[in-house]
């Protein structure tokens, strides 16, 4: 017979980790289920060395450091953590029965903090791309590229941020198919004032190498036949990620474009199931780590009140505990 938990959190990224910690402050019995092999979500797996800019009070905080601090914070409590375990169904009985790829769990409430779901990078679609060993989609140790010629493809926050990071240690070129970047204004200004070589509006058109090591990248100006060739040692593709919410559509929750619709309590269309972070939707929702961290206490406190209506939604402040 499965143990009965007060709160089961689906997702072990930053928002899920903080929700678990806060649930312990309310003395809830809580567990975490995550489909990934490690805690931390995208910041830990995809951006361990990228600076996280939207966590207040922590300048120069990397994805790995954020993850480690949240895990350290949670380690003060006994929290069962189930990794490599995918949630298949959530069935409302007397309690909630969660069926996963490895078994089943019973819980009084559920907080879904699964971010954008399963994710994989959008690939560079050029002939022969699969064979090149120096084409990368994420950075695990930036220092190994010191002094190398680096070219980055993309125009969003990740591409701009990585260009600024690489500029400190390597000759860096950024290629984007549009004149304007889809990144924070402050970052774009820093890019324009940096030593990064900016190629816009250009798109990659041909890979030049021996099939294993890429030596040059041909780029073509958009709506033109003009071409240029870039010498490089490493090519980083930052075209964003394809995400999949998997079985979410089968859980009987109201959705808005694959996001869970929630009310002001962070509660879904099913009473007792809450959603926080990038997986939830409400009018005016902003997808930031900081936003999700703020949503976590709202979901936890309302889950506590759902379990026991005599428990106040507004708890004591942590400074008075």
Swiss-Prot record:
Principal EC category: oxidoreductase
Keyword entries, A-Z: FAD, Flavoprotein, NADP, Oxidoreductase
HAMAP family named in the record: FENR2
GO molecular function, one term: NADP binding
InterPro entries per record: FAD/NAD-bd_sf, FAD/NAD-binding_dom, Fd--NADP_Rdtase_type_2, Ferredoxin-NADP_redctase_2
Species annotation: Streptococcus pneumoniae serotype 4 (strain ATCC BAA-334 / TIGR4)
Subunit and partners: Homodimer.
The keyword NADP is assigned to this record: yes
Protein name: Ferredoxin--NADP reductase
Catalytic activity: 2 reduced [2Fe-2S]-[ferredoxin] + NADP(+) + H(+) = 2 oxidized [2Fe-2S]-[ferredoxin] + NADPH
Pfam families in UniProt: Pyr_redox_2
Lineage: Bacteria, Bacillati, Bacillota, Bacilli, Lactobacillales
């Amino acid at each position: 017979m499965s143990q009965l938990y007060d709160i089961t959190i689906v997702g072990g990224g930053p928002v899920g980790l903080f929700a678990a910690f806060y649930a312990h402050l309310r003395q809830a019995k809580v567990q975490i289920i995550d489909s990934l092999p490690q805690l931390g979500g995208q910041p830990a797996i995809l951006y361990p060395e990228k600076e996280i800019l939207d966590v207040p009070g922590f300048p120069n905080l990397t994805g790995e450091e954020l993850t480690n601090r949240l895990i350290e914070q949670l380690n003060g409590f006994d929290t069962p953590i189930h990794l490599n375990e995918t949630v298949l169904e959530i069935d409302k009985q007397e309690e909630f029965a969660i069926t996963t790829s490895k078994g089943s769990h019973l819980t009084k409430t559920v907080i879904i903090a699964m971010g954008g779901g399963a994710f994989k990078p959008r690939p560079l679609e050029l002939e022969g791309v699969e064979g090149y060993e120096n084409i990368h989609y994420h950075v695990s140790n930036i220092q190994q590229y010191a002094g190398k010629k680096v070219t980055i493809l993309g125009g969003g926050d990740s591409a701009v941020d990585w260009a600024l990071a690489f500029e400190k240690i390597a000759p860096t070129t950024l290629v984007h198919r549009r004149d304007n970047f889809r990144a924070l204004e402050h970052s774009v200004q820093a890019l324009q004032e940096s030593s990064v070589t900016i190629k816009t509006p250009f798109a990659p058109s041909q890979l030049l190498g021996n099939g294993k090591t890429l030596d040059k990248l041909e780029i073509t100006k958009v709506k033109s036949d003009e071409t240029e060739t870039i010498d490089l040692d490493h090519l980083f593709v930052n075209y964003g990620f394809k995400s999949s919410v998997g079985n979410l559509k089968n859980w009987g929750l109201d959705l808005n474009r694959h996001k869970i619709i929630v009310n002001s309590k962070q509660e879904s269309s099913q009473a007792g199931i809450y959603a926080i972070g990038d997986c939830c939707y409400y009018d005016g929702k902003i997808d930031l780590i900081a936003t999700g961290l703020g949503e976590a206490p709202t979901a936890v406190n309302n889950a506590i009140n759902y379990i026991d209506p005599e428990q106040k939604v507004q708890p004591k402040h942590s400074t008075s505990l």
